[in-house]
Amino acid sequence: MDQNGVNAGNGHKSIDLIQIMDKWQKKWTEAKIFEAEHDLRDKFFITAAFPYLNGVLHAGHLRTFTIPETIARYQRMKNKNVLWTFGFHVTGTPILGLANQIKERKEDIIWAYNNLHNIPMDELIKLDTPEAIVECFSKKATEAFKRMGFSLDWRRNFKTDDKVFSKFIEWQFYKLKEMGHITKGSHPVRYCPKCENPVEDHDLLHGEESTTVEYSLIKFTSEFDGKEIIMPMATLRPETLFGVTNAWVNPNEMYVMAEVYDEIQKLDSEDVDLKYNGIWIVGKECADKLKEQDRKIEILKEIKGSELLGLKIKNPVTKKEVPLFPADFVEMGIGTGCVMGVPAHAPYDYIALRDLGKIEEVGLIPLIEIEGYDKFPAKEIVEKLGVKDQNDDELLEQATSKIYKDEFHKGKLNENCGEYAGISVKDIKEKLTKDYLNSNIAEIMYEFSEQKVVCRCGEKCIIKTVKGQWFINYSDENWKKLAHECIDSMNFAPENIRQEFHNKVDWMKDKACARKKGLGTLLPFDENWIIESLSDSTIYMAYYTIARFINEGLTPEQLVPELFEYVFLGNGNVEEIAKNSNISKETIEEMRKEFLYYYPLDWRCSAKDLIPNHLTFMIFNHVALFKKEHWPRGIEINGYVTIEGKKLSKSKGPVLPVSEVAENFGADVARFYITTCAELPQDADVKFKEMEKARDNLIKLYELAVSVMEEESTQKEFSLIDKWLLHKTYSSIKGAETAYEEFQLRKIGLMFYELINDLRWYKRRGGENNNVLKEVVEIWTKLLSPVTPHLCEEIWEKLGYSGFISQEMYPEIKSELINEDLELGEEFIKSAMEDIRNIKGVAKINPEKMYLYTADDWKYDLLEFMNENSEKNVKAIIPLVMKEDKFKRHGKEVMKLINEIMKIGVKKAIAEVEILENAKTFIESEFDCEVIVNGEDVKGKKKFAIPYKPAIYME
């Protein structure tokens, strides 16, 4: 077993999956069957979020990419002209950081890339430049895609550091700025002090989902050491200021007394003026943070927290003085290190005061009325839960969470809140914050939503107000309306993620779009900045449509903005553009046709981590730049991947490189398993034993194909079991079609395993018609070919067909072979046999004779009545049944039977007697005894029979 946990071979006595994989990949490449260009067919355009090349492609990529790959192959079978291609993301700082770490021979990085990413040491030590890393991992990613048999149009491949791609991004940013969507100013951003850059989700080692949280700093005042001071309290709930009885400091930590100056940026300049803002007392960590957020801090002295105890500070709203008390629960890494005490509503505050014996001294001030609570909610819930003291963290968290939730949704401010009385808690924050800021009794401070936010370089990130920073103004309400309109018009798989996108749009704020370091496109109107990696990856799907023309040899100089303006928007004079770009008019017109043919994008596929950034940005940028008819049509979201329960990690493992999976199991096994092991948007846990099981079952289909070709075809009439297998197979055509259309690929796997079981049952029931088996294999080879194309190509060839199954049409349903009664009949036999086994087991007998009794006619009449009635609720259907005389006379027995029928499921009545008679020989052989259907009613057993549940007597 290697560092990634792989311990499985690909060999099998009857088939070599790797040899088959090699064979068909070579044939596909030579035939160029996946190259797509516009024609008269309906198009289908699908893409996935391209991978970032700071490592090999891993199991997480495999799931995200195999889903659209499977759908692309299916859509080709539906006679769609499918465009499915890939690019590589290399811009930003992670690759730069990795190159530096390799150059510095960081032990953990060297170990990870040698052992987890499988880079030989002699090759690894050469990856000390961004260019070397991009070259290495782009080759490995290309190889991985090809080894998995992805049906890509490789003519359209590109990297985001290509000079020609940069010209496309320059056009995008010129357009956004022209529309007023790009602005320059000061804004708080996630920032790496070491890299000297704003950082985005992809730049982070920890805290990828962290957001910037806005705290209100409430300016309490006092006198300390002979000076008037401000002691700011950070809070997310400014309304609680009306209920403050005390404040908390950590007696064991260090604070500072410092002069604070506000930095006010000069108009049209990055220079600042300083405005005195008083002497503040805050925690040391807070002082460091404030320095980065538009303030200059000059420290006068350091103070131990214990020195502040006994100090009284004035509430700026109520004007009441409150004491400072000690509290170890005050975290210095959040806020100012000084916390307001609101014991009537905060369980932590109440229990801390109770532990100190200070409740009577300071009292409780209620400020929020909540339905279902008394005057002092914190006291009530602490006593109800039995919280012992401040160390009872679990119960305190539970209490806090419940109160805050109830206050937010059901609470309103009481008379202690003056002019704000009667306003609901959920509506007050914005108004209060605005009023406090205008009155100069509060300021704003920014914190991360998570404490551990670490750049890939290893440095702890901060929130920094960057001056002269370029932003995309995603906060624009009119722009958000268009984004919402787009989301409403789109398809989502699964559907329930639609609301999450609406929520992300509502929460969207302005975003830094450029940085000083890293790989990428220079900001065309300010070349001191480089466009960051989540801003150059929002509309590249449009670039795919014309990339094959560009990759034929067009130069960056030829890709003038007017070219993109015409190709994507239809603006401009094509003759002038041809003259200015030195690109033929015919080529430009072909580029325009190709874009118009393939756009809009039908489906965008990604893992769920890209919902709050890339995917939402994609929607914003499309609605800004493109006509409505070219807005994206659909987004598919899959969950994460774990390996034997362990979370994937590029630095610690496991990684499970895609190429390693292909070589150990074969591409088809990996494709089948990763697409069918979990439904959207659930996470998938890769289990190698289950992969081996999938491999074995796929090989059974191959072996069946070989056997049906080796045996002579029979010409006998179809038996009932033949008809049953054909019914099941042709029913699968529609089921698989629905599964593919709705991205429910796990159902394909379940249907395949059902096929394996059906084939076992068919053989067990005496099925041996080779013509039937060949027809079943042909259909299922087509149904599975989007998932397991190599194996299906091989089977197709074994069946005697020429050409590629990859170019075959989806199988058509033969409606004359669909007969639900056959399926119900076989399920009836299986159920009856299971009941027989259970009775044998309980009675511990081996019968010589067995009686099977079917239900009385009136019971079938009741089944039909229930089947035809739309009402499926027991209580509702009983009155309807009892109106019928033929049922009413059976009294209580009817009530019992209705419940029994509901348990087994309301189905149509079938010819049970005929079915049992036809299966009698089979049942006799299974149980080695004589079977009698509806013979003498021995010991009155027949009355116990109900539809689909024959009564059984053995002797």
Curated annotation (Swiss-Prot):
Record's GO cellular component terms: cytoplasm
GO BP field: leucyl-tRNA aminoacylation
Motif 'HIGH' region per record, residues: 51-61
Enzymatic reactions: tRNA(Leu) + L-leucine + ATP = L-leucyl-tRNA(Leu) + AMP + diphosphate
Subcellular location: Cytoplasm
Molecular function (Gene Ontology), one example: aminoacyl-tRNA deacylase activity
Domain of life: Archaea
Database matches in CDD domains: Anticodon_Ia_Leu_AEc (cd07959)
Residues annotated for ATP binding in this entry: K650
Renumbered ranges of motif 'KMSKS' region: 647-651
Family designation: Belongs to the class-I aminoacyl-tRNA synthetase family.
Protein's UniProt name: Leucine--tRNA ligase
Source species: Methanococcus maripaludis (strain C7 / ATCC BAA-1331)
Classification of source organism: Archaea, Methanobacteriati, Methanobacteriota, Methanomada group, Methanococci
Gene field: leuS
